[in-house]
Amino acid sequence: MAGAKEIRSKIASVQNTQKITKAMEMVAASKMRKSQDRMASSRPYADTMRKVIGHLANGNLEYKHPYLEERDVKRVGYLVVSTDRGLCGGLNINLFKKLLADMKVWSDKGVQSDIAMIGSKGVSFFNSVGGNIVAQVTGMGDNPSLSELIGPVKVMLQAYDEGRLDRLYVVSNKFINTMSQVPTLTQLLPLPASEDQELKQKAWDYLYEPDPKPLLDTLLRRYVESQVYQGVVENLASEQAARMVAMKAATDNGGSLIKELQLVYNKARQASITQELTEIVGGASAV
């Protein structure tokens, strides 16, 4: 059994670690609330854009934009939103598993994949397991802006425009609540038709001023950008929630470990005192 001094040192070490994890839990909780506010403020715009695009996809348009037309799929692209930091449980690995599963489905059909990665954890993971990363952005911090995302989005849209990609997805974690974050894979291009039954039963006609082409060119790009940005802010809220839960679990585990070490320490003290008493009694008997 370890000596009392060694056990006291272990207890002190665990207590110091526990203070760190508790502080990280509180910081993550504060950042999560801010991320939730940012997510809530951007969600109405993203949802409205999704509805407008759903109308367009179901509509009888005089100008058929390339983003609305289905193609034979020979190559797919993924805009993947991961985190820059760890200590957030299985948030990233669950997302990567979902992505790899979808990539395998396409690979079995002879379709290749390109990845535009957001977040350093995703870059590290796919550099190690293998993946064709064509664009990346890292270090966006806790307050990401749309301008920081333009690079990867532009690369993928250009590839789609030039026919080098036939389908484009955004992959990110959807924030449900503090305890639940769900990895999601959403098709961006070609634009999926709305699942709203009311829209499917109606024929939509549109009048454009002055001309449909420049309007749709701008609107559809804004749609893609808005969905990627929404994925980033939701993933950030998911990251902070997962980190808060992970740090709380670490703090609680530290408390349990301290109790176990305290019990071992008490037994060691008891054994030490018993041994000293035995030596004293033995010495007295010898006299």
Swiss-Prot record:
Pfam families from the UniProt entry: ATP-synt
Compartment(s) where it occurs, according to its Swiss-Prot or TrEMBL record: Cell inner membrane
Record note on quaternary structure: F-type ATPases have 2 components, CF(1) - the catalytic core - and CF(0) - the membrane proton channel. CF(1) has five subunits: alpha(3), beta(3), gamma(1), delta(1), epsilon(1). CF(0) has three main subunits: a, b and c.
Gene name of the record: atpG
Alphabetized HAMAP family for the sequence: ATP_synth_gamma_bact (MF_00815)
Function according to Swiss-Prot or TrEMBL: Produces ATP from ADP in the presence of a proton gradient across the membrane. The gamma chain is believed to be important in regulating ATPase activity and the flow of protons through the CF(0) complex.
Organism: Enterobacter sp. (strain 638)
A GO term from the CC aspect: plasma membrane
PROSITE patterns (alphabetical): ATPASE_GAMMA
CDD domains assigned: F1-ATPase_gamma (cd12151)
GO biological process: proton motive force-driven plasma membrane ATP synthesis
Membrane topology: Peripheral membrane protein
Family of this protein: Belongs to the ATPase gamma chain family.
One Gene Ontology MF term: proton-transporting ATP synthase activity, rotational mechanism
Record keywords, A-Z: ATP synthesis, Cell inner membrane, Cell membrane, CF(1), Hydrogen ion transport, Ion transport, Membrane, Transport
Source species taxonomy: Bacteria, Pseudomonadati, Pseudomonadota, Gammaproteobacteria, Enterobacterales
Protein name (record): ATP synthase gamma chain
Record NCBIfam families: ATPsyn_F1gamma, PRK05621.1-1
